[in-house]
Amino acid sequence: QIEERVKRIPLVKSCEAHHDFSGVISVSVKEYKPIARIVRSTIGTSPFPDQYISEDGKFIGTSPLFTPRIIVTGGPYFDGKRDLQDRRGRTLIPFFQFIENNEFWKAQISQIIVAKDGGIVLIPTLGTTRIDFGLPMNIENKFKKLFIFYQKVIPNKGWNKYSWVQLKYKNQVICE
């Protein structure tokens, strides 16, 4: 009974309970590690509430008691989805993990919008520029290009010079 009650907590991955001969109960719990939070639009077609994405691509419920500091995502891609176990969804997992594990990008990106086709738009914390990341392929190379843009262009042109930065093309950063 204890195991079943603990497993109902949204962030619990697994639970084992046992007692020793003296009657002491021990409970071992493994938690899901959330790497992103899906904020669903009330206008969208999804019947699902906001959820977390775990490190293995499962969607898990939010908790009223705890809110982890993780990246916020949303967009038409998530409408009707129950997990990221399809081919395109599995490409998003390393993308979210990359940001979650990189303190610089975790601080620089406030939101990620995922289009129906899986294309990604980054909303930075500073400025009004939108960053068209494209599909989540060549993740490290695209973030290297963006970092160079931050180092070389932003100091000279300012945060609000460009409305769009495109990273989706190989060996190019296109600014509009």
List where the protein language model places each region.
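Charged, solvent-exposed interaction patches on well-folded alpha/beta domains
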Residues: 3-8, 13-176
